[in-house]
A protein has these predicted regions:
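Bacterial N-terminal signal peptides that target proteins for export
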Residues: 1-7
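Cross-family signature of deubiquitinases and ubiquitin-like deconjugating cysteine proteases
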Residues: 9, 19-20, 33-61, 70, ...
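C-terminal motif of bacterial Sec signal peptides marking the signal peptidase cleavage site
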Residues: 15-17
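Bacterial Sec signal peptide processing site at the extreme N-terminus
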Residues: 19-27
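Active-site signature of cysteine proteases
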Residues: 21, 35, 125-261
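Active-site nucleophilic cysteine motif
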Residues: 41-55, 86-98, 204
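Structural recognition of the beta-strand scaffold that forms the well-ordered cores
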Residues: 45-48, 71-75, 96-99, 107-109, ...
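Papain-like cysteine protease catalytic cores
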Residues: 66-137
């Protein structure tokens, strides 16, 4: 959901503005552990990278460790094609959850970022001495309905599920619509209680892994990006809070994180 589009250029300029500013002294209010930053390359699969990064960090914080393959999601998307023929890889983060529930998941080590088309899609997953089908493995790392999909649309009824009217929502997924202040409170509470949150805008998606502030007390959200490590901050983005909330169209967190008081 990034390369080869005007939207990508807008998002790229936005993120350059966020992350290429003169160096600042950031104070981390919270920074969650994470798997290594991946690189989506020329694909438009940022929605898959962001959602899987969220699941990975959630598992690390449970004392588990998984490293999942966005390339597998991209291959399964070919069986579940988008009506967008010009940009067939674009979708929402909810699509990653839907594809996992339907087609399963494999580990990053067997289908990494640089996997060529000649590298076959594995039929089995071997993990800690156990053998799983991709579907069994997916359900072990992300149970169906484990995550809540949230949005804020003032023109629609709150606390009802609504269809977010963006082209990437070609699956017609319905998200829980809540007030912006409530969405902010749930997000900050989740992070402070050590739960990652998946963030999505109209042009990009990333995993929120922390919060920070600078010497002027300006607040930032620390985002795990999917453009490789040859970037400022090793592939992390320090996005000012006002920009993050201005651009958000959807957030995803576990039901456990959402229910925190």
């Amino acid at each position: 959901m990034k390369i080869q589009s005007v939207v990508f250029m807008v998002v790229a300029l936005l993120l350059m503005g966020c992350s290429n500013r003169p160096p600042k002294e950031y104070v981390h209010d919270v920074l969650l552990p994470m798997t290594p930053v991946k690189n989506q390359g020329a694909t438009e699969l940022c929605w898959a990278y962001a959602m899987l990064a969220t699941i990975e960090t959630e598992h690390i914080l449970r004392g588990d460790s998984v490293n999942l393959s966005p390339v597998y999601i991209g291959r399964m998307l070919e069986h579940h094609p988008s009506p967008n023929k010009e940009q067939p890889q674009r979708a929402m983060c909810q699509t990653a959850l839907n594809l996992m529930a339907r087609y399963g998941m494999v580990g990053y080590d067997v289908l990494p970022d640089d996997a060529t088309p000649e590298l076959s899609t594995p039929k089995w997953v071997f993990m800690l001495g156990a053998k799983y089908t991709p579907l069994e493995f997916a359900h072990s790392v992300c149970a169906p309905d484990e995550y809540l999909s949230l949005t804020c649309c003032p023109d629609s009824p709150y606390y009802k599920k609504i269809e977010v009217p963006v082209p990437d929502n070609w699956e017609h997924n319905r998200l829980l619509n809540i007030p912006l202040d409530t969405l902010k409170a749930h997000t900050d509470r989740a992070l402070l209680h050590r739960h990652p949150v998946c963030w999505e805008s109209r042009g990009h998606a990333m995993c929120i892994v922390g919060m920070a502030h600078d010497s002027l007390q300006q607040r930032y959200y620390i985002m795990k990006n999917s453009w490789g490590t040859d970037q400022p901050h090793g592939g992390l983005v320090y996005m000012p809070a006002d920009e993050m909330w201005r651009d958000v169209i959807a957030l995803y967190m576990t039901k456990e994180a959402y229910s925190l008081e």
